[in-house]
């Protein structure tokens, strides 16, 4: 996966010479600095699983008119973003395998153009995926705190504008990232975007969890059943931990990698961290696999429609 143009910088900082990197890496920690050799088959397998999962989500939402609402449209867009992550990963891996085995022989200029197209798709899907995770969090927040006004706040027109804005911004940002990938300011913007989404989700989901605990506590005190409060609080805490934990675990290492690229590109310990770049890509692809389980498959209506889709009862 090292052909990624903007992520080529991410993997091997342009302002650190190859010699400095290898020497620093060798002196920093020995064997554990050699990185992790991840087979292409794992990239292909995870990409295929994610592609199938997210295709099913999109098909189910399109099929069932009961799911034609802003909330499910946002989930559908997240599935499309994750699907693009999978497709770009599959294309990249297959492209590399065919070239490595001599099956595909292409001029270097064409390879660069194809590489840039795939890179743009990857960057756009990463930005849009992060964006729709934030949009879904905001949508859930409005659903809980402004339930009576939800349909007047989140109209179909506003939902369409939101989705179009995210896709447009993702396309523009990916183009800028591909063009100016050697500029640290671009990486800082990407890091800032991730931190903003992380803080946004933390604040919104914790506030929602606090409100849920308050409601359950008041109900249990009226019914004099503290067990209800403890059970519901535990379930809410588990859900919150899963939501934020998956987001942080899957995306955190990659963006921490970006932070190190900007702050210490030649530091021996940083170069050790850089050697695990493929692992961070695997975690991002894993996020595309897990997203449908968290945001889509928990809906009973969507699960029922998925069964119909799988059984081809259109």
Swiss-Prot record:
Keywords: Cell membrane, G-protein coupled receptor, Glycoprotein, Lipoprotein, Membrane, Palmitate, Phosphoprotein, Receptor, Transducer, Transmembrane, Transmembrane helix. Residues 62-70, 139-161, 210-237, 298-314 are cytoplasmic. The chain crosses the membrane at residues 36-61, 71-91, 117-138, 162-181, 190-209, 238-263, 277-297. GO terms for molecular function: melanocyte-stimulating hormone receptor activity. GO terms for cellular component: cytoplasm; plasma membrane. It holds the Pfam family 7tm_1. It is a multi-pass membrane protein. A lipid is attached at residue 312 (S-palmitoyl cysteine). It is found in: Cell membrane. The keyword Transmembrane applies. Residues 1-35, 92-116, 182-189, 264-276 are extracellular. PROSITE patterns: G_PROTEIN_RECEP_F1_1 (PS00237), G_PROTEIN_RECEP_F1_2 (PS50262). SUPFAM superfamilies: Family A G protein-coupled receptor-like (SSF81321). It comes from the Eukaryota. Glycans are attached at residues 15, 20, 23. One of its GO terms (biological process) is regulation of metabolic process. Belongs to the G-protein coupled receptor 1 family. Receptor for MSH (alpha, beta and gamma) and ACTH. The activity of this receptor is mediated by G proteins which activate adenylate cyclase. Mediates melanogenesis via regulation of cAMP signaling in melanocytes. This is Melanocyte-stimulating hormone receptor. It comes from Gallus gallus. The gene is MC1R.
């Amino acid at each position: 996966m090292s052909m990624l143009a903007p992520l080529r910088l991410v993997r091997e900082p342009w302002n650190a010479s190859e010699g400095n990197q290898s020497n620093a890496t060798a002196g920093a920690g020995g064997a554990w600095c050699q990185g992790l050799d991840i087979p292409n088959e794992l990239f292909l397998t995870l990409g295929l699983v994610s592609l199938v999962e997210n295709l099913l989500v999109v098909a189910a939402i399109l099929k069932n008119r009961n799911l034609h609402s802003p909330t499910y449209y946002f989930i559908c867009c997240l599935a499309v973003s994750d699907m693009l992550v999978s497709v770009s990963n599959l294309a990249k891996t297959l492209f590399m395998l065919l070239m490595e085995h001599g099956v595909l022989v292409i001029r270097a200029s064409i390879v660069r153009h194809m590489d840039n197209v795939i890179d743009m798709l990857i960057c756009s899907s990463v930005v849009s995926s992060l964006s729709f995770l934030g949009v879904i969090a905001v949508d859930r927040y409005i659903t809980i705190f402004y339930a009576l006004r939800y349909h007047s706040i989140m109209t179909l027109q506003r939902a369409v504008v939101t989705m179009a804005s995210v896709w447009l911004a993702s396309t523009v940002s990916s183009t800028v990232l591909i063009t100016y990938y050697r500029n640290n300011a671009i990486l800082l913007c990407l890091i800032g975007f991730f931190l903003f989404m992380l803080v946004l989700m933390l604040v919104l989901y914790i506030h929602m969890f606090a409100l849920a605990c308050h409601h359950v506590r008041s109900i249990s005190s009226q019914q004099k059943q503290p067990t209800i409060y403890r059970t519901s609080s535990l379930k809410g805490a588990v859900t919150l931990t899963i939501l934020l934990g998956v987001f942080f675990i899957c995306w955190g290492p990659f963006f921490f990698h970006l932070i190190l690229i900007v702050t210490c590109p030649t530091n021996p310990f940083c170069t050790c961290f850089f050697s695990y770049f493929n692992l961070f890509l695997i975690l991002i692809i894993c996020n595309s696999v897990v997203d449908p389980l968290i945001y889509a498959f928990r809906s009973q209506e969507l699960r029922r429609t998925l069964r119909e889709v799988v059984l081809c009862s259109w």
